[in-house]
A protein has these predicted regions:
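Nucleotide donor/acceptor-binding cores
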Residues: 209-211, 307-308
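Rossmann-like S-adenosyl-L-methionine
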Residues: 2-13, 21, 220, 224-235, ...
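Extended interfacial segments that mediate partner engagement and assembly in macromolecular machines
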Residues: 62-74, 83-187, 222
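Short, acidic/hydrophobic/Gly-rich beta-strand patch recurrent on exposed beta strands
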Residues: 25-30, 147-150, 214-216, 344
Length: 453
């Protein structure tokens, strides 16, 4: 069939050739690509066209005529509706292979780099891994419920469990939902701006078993607040109950004010033997088991002997910095969020690590100032947001010429782009190691080390 003859709502047969970065299958009609969610490479499907653009279109899978050997039955009852996971229909081995392939292809396409990409480091059990949940509260069929948003929507799915959340946090969300309903608490309505409770958030410390519950409310006063807290304390094993007040009409979850309603205002966890105090706001990796794997890759890549000066750009609460400080002469960390820097300093003190310096500011401004002041890195670590490293920071790295750059990435595309700039500037990379931090989703983390040639 010619692509020019395709029409909206038309049913067509085609073979899926590949997966996109967001996990949709890709099939082609006369060279014209159609993106079809919930399909896998090698499958012959019948699909209904739902949208046609000039260069590509979208279709909805109707039937599978030939099933991939990698297809599995998703165990989650609401997988087809929920926007949280996108790869439950693909076997876990298939997911790991998909992520490795994504990294390898991205390195070639964007970075023009011929590097070794080993098999993705996955989990023995890829379920129940998340130590943090942020669950919106709303009315479904006239009842208060807490669940996740439907795909491309703010309609809440009524769900009893989430298979990628840890059991303790999952149970706490369900109990909290019951207790709020018992007292007639009114969920926040996005359209009217009325209601009392917006989100239930949990944080669980994997190594200590401590659990924090956060109630995000529209105002400080909430009907039956004391009774709700009392019931929560009696029915759940909690370390902390915190209230966040967010009175604004916004999609941002947290407001500016925090109030501890019961217990401590932090929970404590450990990574590689380093203790971390975690508040409701702290940035902290959500998969504790794989964080150990990811950071071990960074530690091994740094090859520290105790004589090195290390700079950690985008240091957050100091999680990588403090793991490296055990083996370095001195570690300097920079982060734009001041609260994170305060947390990093507190965590250094908690671990009695005196060979650290943390400063608030933009990495691309602070690190050049350090360089001018005579602070030069033997090893420079970057763990940037999805947009990758700032151009000015990359220029500073090329001027400073640290012996090694350890790059921890959450976006293969910007990793490949930045590696191209660094390799053009005299650095050499031999491999990029993918790490699966988020099973059942398309998100990929990767670690590489670039050596000055």
């Amino acid at each position: 069939m010619e692509a020019s003859l395709l029409k909206k709502n038309q049913s067509i047969e085609l073979t899926i050739e590949d997966l996109t970065h967001d996990g949709s299958g890709v099939g082609k009609i006369d060279g014209y690509p159609l993106f079809i969610p919930n399909t896998l490479p090698g499958e012959k499907v019948t699909a209904k066209i739902i949208k046609l653009n000039k260069n590509y279109g979208f279709a909805r899978m109707e039937t599978i005529e030939s099933v991939s050997a990698d297809r599995v039955e998703p165990p989650c009852a609401v997988y087809s509706k929920c926007g949280g996971c996108s790869l439950q229909h693909l076997s876990y081995d298939g997911q790991l292979a998909f992520k490795r392939n994504q990294v390898e292809e991205t390195m070639k396409r964007i970075g023009k780099l011929n590097v070794d990409v080993p098999e993705t480091l996955g989990m023995e059990n890829p379920w129940r891994y998340r130590n943090k949940s942020q669950v919106p509260v709303g009315f479904v069929n006239g009842k208060l419920t807490a669940g996740f948003y439907q795909k491309r929507s703010h309609a809440i799915i009524d769900m009893s469990t989430c298979l990628i959340h840890n059991e303790q946090g999952d149970f706490a969300v369900q109990k909290t939902r019951e207790i709020l309903a018992k007292y007639g608490t009114e969920p926040y309505d996005e359209k009217t701006g009325k209601g009392d409770i917006r989100h239930i958030m949990t944080r669980f410390a994997h190594t200590t078993g401590q659990l924090m519950l956060v109630l995000v409310t529209t105002k400080e006063r909430m009907p039956f607040k004391n009774e709700i807290v009392q019931d929560l304390v009696e029915q759940l094993e909690l370390t902390s109950i915190v209230q966040n007040i967010n009175p604004h009409k916004t999609n941002v979850i947290f407001g500016d004010r925090m109030k501890t309603l019961w217990g401590k205002d932090i929970i404590e966890d450990t990574i590689h033997g380093i203790r971390f105090a975690i508040s409701a706001r702290s940035f902290y990796q959500v998969n504790p088991l794989q964080t150990e794997v990811l950071y071990q890759q960074a530690i091994d890549a740094a090859e520290l002997t105790g004589e090195e000066t290390v700079i950690d750009a985008y240091c957050g609460i100091g999680s990588i910095s403090l793991c490296l400080a055990k083996k370095a002469k001195h570690v300097y960390g920079v982060e734009i969020v001041d609260q994170a820097i305060q947390d990093a300093r507190a965590n250094a003190e908690l671990n009695e690590l005196t060979n650290t310096t943390f400063e608030t500011g933009k990495a691309e401004e602070v690190i050049p100032a350090w360089y001018k002041a005579g602070i030069e890195a033997d090893v420079l670590v970057v763990d940037p947001p999805r947009k990758g490293c700032d151009e000015k920071l990359l220029e500073t790295i090329l001027a400073m010429k640290p012996k090694k750059v350890v790059y921890v990435s959450c976006n293969p595309g910007t990793l490949a782009r930045d590696m191209k700039i660094l390799t053009d500037g005299g650095y050499v990379a031999k491999k990029v190691q993918p790490v699966d931090m988020f099973p059942m989703t398309t998100h990929i983390e990767a670690v590489t080390v670039l050596h000055l040639n």
